[in-house]
Structure formats: C-alpha cells, structure tokens
Curated annotation (Swiss-Prot):
The gene is rsxG. This is Ion-translocating oxidoreductase complex subunit G. GO terms for molecular function: electron transfer activity; FMN binding. Its EC number is 7.-.-.-. It is a single-pass membrane protein.
Amino acid sequence: MLKTIRKHGITLALFAAGSTGLTAVINQMTKSTIHEQALQQQHALFDQVLPPDRYNNNLQESCYLVDAPALGKGTHRVFIARKDDKPVAAIIEATAPDGYSGAIQLIVGADFNGTILGTRVTEHHETPGLGDKIERRLSDWITHFSGKTISGENDTHWAVKKDGGDFDQFTGATITPRAVVNAVKRAGLYAESLPAQLPHLTACGE
C-alpha cells in the first residue's frame, strides 16, 4: 500500500513539474509572439508618418527618452531616423493636454528643418461623431499635416481656420482639432532642436 501511494505521489509530482514547465514554455512563447506583433504594429504605424525611403537604420532600436515641456507632461520617446548613419528625421511622441475630453496622444514624423512628414493619433477620448475625426480610419483630416513646414513659433498658418490659420476645424468641434494642431506644431519645432541634443539623450532601456 505504501509503495503504491509513494508511486502515485511520485507520478503526481512528475506530472505537476511537467505541467509547470510546459506552462512556462507556453507563456514564454506567448510573450514572444505578443512582443513581435507589437513591434510589427509599431513599424506599420511608423511607416505612416515617416516614408521608409528616407532612412536605412533600425528605427525601433534608435529610441531615446526626453522630458520636454513642448511635448507635454512626463517622459516621451523619440525615434531618430538615420540615412547612412546621418540623422535625418525623427518620430516624436507628443501629448496634446487640452483635448475636449482630456489628453490626446500623438506621434509626429518631422525632419530637422521644420517640415512635418506625417502625424497619427494613438490615443484619445474625444466625442464620437465629433472630435473623433482626428482618427485616420474616420477622416483624412490628420493627413493634412504632411509636407507642411513651420516657419517659427509665431507662424500664423499653424492654427485652425477659426483662429486665422490653415487647418479645418470640425463642425461642432473646434477644441479637438485646435489641440492637435498646436501639439503637432510644438513637436515640429522641438524636432529642429534634436540634432544638437543627440549626444546627451538617454537611450530607451538604459
């Protein structure tokens, strides 16, 4: 009887150990898959704001952390695009703190001469049917920044039409597009200062 119990106990212990090991392997594989999918989604998003033919480095591995009031409160990531090792542009995470329903998160592709290469909203809580037209899937409004140049802090073109600028506001919703226009402008101006900052920036993960 004792031998039988001992045998069953050993069998259960081995089964438990095997199950634990299998679970660990599956979890690791799942984490790797999720991480790979996240990188692919990020790469696809980057392609929307920075033409791939402008750079030839691994953009996702050229990540830096910055604390800049121009980009909003807290730490934001900046990805530096290089062509043959020369910095040529950046993808900048930015926050518009003054959306109608809270902060709006963006990524902005820009060169170092004040030209916006692309913009996408990555997170927001704006009103459905009104402010949510900042999403690319709902409207092409966000694409109108591409190719626009900022001549300086006082560039009056960088405002919604209601404020005398060049960008459309939405019917019944001016606060949301105004917040995005201003955030993109600030990010574009910040991009001009990046080349001088590069030697002093902290790499992501450090």
